[in-house]
Amino acid sequence: NKLPFDNFITVRPENIYASYMKKNIKSIVPELIDRLSALGYNILYLPRYKIDNLYFSQKNNVYVPPQPLNGLDICYYSTAVLTGAGTFAREAACLGVPAVSFYAGKTLLAVDKKMIKDGWMFFSRDSEKIIDYIQTKKRRNVSLERSKQVKNEVIDKLKAVIENL
């Protein structure tokens, strides 16, 4: 899938229908998209439900892909990733991409709390604070050496298991 723009912010809404969410939660995504759009940002919008497409598909600088895209590729090429969940934000943060969680659930996971505390990820449900964050936060340089080392260790262990069969 070719996106209609090279520079973009990825937005994924909250899963407001999930059982782990607070009751009667109101999504911040409409306000967030309106503000980002008014500031001239290109937005890759990844809806959870078909009804999510109705409002955002009308904007010129909002692209809703017709089919699923590879999440890690999206994170890597995004200027920032804003999501109403945690996994997507964690993946982006690990790649050095400015990552925002506006999760509306009852409790943040310990891993999210740690990443927020360490400055890898930002948490807010205030669209103004989120926009301030992405306007000032730049991509972090990330060393992939440790990842490569772990990958090689796993491969070596798998080879040893296979050889002993």
Q: Which positions does each model-derived feature cover?
A:
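Active-site donor-nucleotide binding/catalytic segment of nucleotide-sugar enzymes
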Residues: 1-52
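Short amphipathic alpha-helical segments
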Residues: 22-23, 56-58, 93-96, 112-113
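Active-site-proximal loop->helix
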Residues: 109-120
